[in-house]
Amino acid sequence: MHYLIWPLVKFLVAFIIVQVIVAAMNWIERRLLGLMQARLGPNRVGSEIGIPWGLGQILADPIKFLLKEDIVPSSAEKVAYYLGPMMSILPALIVFCLIPYGPPPTFAPTQVNVGLLLILALTSTSVYGIILGGWASNNKYSLMGALRSAAQMVSYEVPFGLSIVGVLMISGSLDLVKIVRYQEMHVWNLFPQLVGCFTFFVAMNAENNRTPFDLPEAESELVAGYHTEYSAMKFAFYMLGEYSGMLVNCCLFTVLYLGGWTLCIAEWGITTTSLSKLGIVGGLIGAAIFIAKVMAIMMVYIWFRATFPRFRFDQLMDLGWKWMIPLALANIFVTGIILLALPAVEVGGIWHWLGEVILSIAGAAIIAFTLFLLTRTAKPARRIPAHAG
């Protein structure tokens, strides 16, 4: 019986943790955007009862969604209309149960040999909730947003998956815990897999429909995109799905490229072995390190939103098919050549560090060359001819 109860407990714990973090993320994002745009952001709610810095906004938002009127279009396909928001958030919650956020076994809830492959399969299903909601709303703006989201997901799922192949080649495993342990014995994959890291970050922004890739819900073009006809808690589920997807991608980025819950390398830093000797205290230390890295990636997410304007749809497709996919393939090619050229030696040997350095330099060179080509091949701005009269 416990085989049925234990997964359910994990899912409920993941749901509670994710929703608390998502609520805090929303407040942090609004405050940081306020600072970046030379304004205050939410800083008043809760001050009457002694809650500082506007932190009461974290509680005010869910209360607002609970109390708002729930309007359902009369022409909507009811079953699909209600399924859309739920299917949008469910994959992120399941994936969160698979990500190790601390040293095993306590802080790695489910260790799967093909965990990374399973995560890629699950994250790609979140688009079905968007497509269902857009189609079932029986609204032209919603349908257009859903179609945009489908095209965007197809375009960026390819570089999203290809960017991870380099990590699999050097670590030799699909198990996320083993990938973290490889990094603590070598060096963070951020350095030897610089191109894959760059491609992965761009692709995960696009998969989450975040600015500058937010064309499925472009307010200036499609009112609110696929969730135009949603209100109250159904709209909140779509918002939670977006932020939960952001959180999952930041966790995945931390595991794949930033060494997970470890610091530095085995000879000097905090490793899985050293944390395991401290028991639950070591687990909490590892989880705190992991959360700090995730929050750092989240800050970059927000920085991107505040910095870059929205792409046109043709620019979005060009970036995915003409630049990100070739970049990811080049990373796989270079990684394979270096792994074949250099012999397998012990950790810390001259050949080991030579391979890491060559991969890092090659990655930086590829990114620099790509940025140079982008500036040389940029399309001229479209100009409207002057009125003859």
Residue ranges, per PLM feature:
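Selective transmembrane helix interface/packing segments
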Residues: 1-389
